């Protein structure tokens, strides 16, 4: 089997009967459209705009959304909408480029704009439409997020102009009779205040979709799928103690009971005291078998001398598989020869997207994830990945519904490769110990100040550069630590957390005073995009 590409999830009819097809024209916000549709309780999937006609027809969508994109409809070989989209007789919503492509398809005029609109804007509601009636921030106005160079200047026949801005004559167009709609702005981003309301109106009232994509229904669907996939076979789960693998453990335990064995691998790349904490949490809250494996020496030896981030991820992925294979053999020997055939992982949708191994297959490789692009081709197990098409906040909701403790569910994410991708360059035990101590100080101060709950993810990064410092009357030439904290809902986009200066100062002073090997602390003010959340 191909372990690197996502297969379409087959859901039970009750939860998947009403669904939306999203055709991706390359927008950086495309994944957010899927998030917002699912927030409305409606199942959706996203495919590249040029999938073949049969797949569009067979999908059975009750509505189609055309995403934005970086192209111009005037450019040679620019993306075009498949005619099948408009032959199905279902509602269609075009966003940004999707609106422009739809306008051109039906005979409207699209021009390059003299004034490009990027950022916040206020549009005037000039007309009426099923999509917009009763949805506004103030009297006949909407606060939205624009990101376009071209604009529709002449609406196609049958379309009414619903909204405009001083520089964009058609910000919303609508053909209520055929249920075709175009938005020049991005309803999927949080900066568009009524964006969720607009998308909810489209999927529920215009497409007539029920809100059946709920945590309870997702859990029922997944349990049914897991039972069907696994049968009476044995499953090994690589447990990290993070949200994703914990939810997978709960789902599998509910589906197959004692056919599941969890292996917690202490790689030497964990946070301070994390191994003991994970074992304690699972002993107190989960009735699953957990085996702890001390593999610090194995991982550090495998990583010795390697500084390339992609290579480190792949080494860590391969070493994990070696440890799991070893554990599987030992478990088999201790359980009357029962062979473990399945390996379960906490892979989630952003992992797949950033590894460019999703069903689209068109994204640039940003970074491999050890449980996606970092797995060996000759993997001896069949993969079980029940969260592979879910976003992080959906996973958290599943965890809460499954009854996992809030402390476990609300933990900040920790990457599978652990500190291996938070130590820039070569990984050594010395660097790992320094980073562990610095990270623990950062977490302690965040929790004391109440900022841990206000941030989605925070951590320290070891930088393999030295900086001159002064301690007393002496010179200190030591390492640099960077602090990173972000605010995000879905981890597809994020902004750096605006921590109070006095908090940053406290953390910085403690790290430099308590860790002799550190002489300087910096704070990362990069947002995603263009940066990723993790440094490597």
Curated annotation (Swiss-Prot):
It comes from the Bacteria. Disulfide bonds: none annotated. GO terms for cellular component: cytosol. The keyword tRNA-binding does not apply. Signal peptide: none annotated. HAMAP family: GMP_synthase. Homodimer. This is GMP synthase [glutamine-hydrolyzing]. It comes from Psychrobacter arcticus (strain DSM 17307 / VKM B-2377 / 273-4). The lineage of its organism: Bacteria, Pseudomonadati, Pseudomonadota, Gammaproteobacteria, Moraxellales.
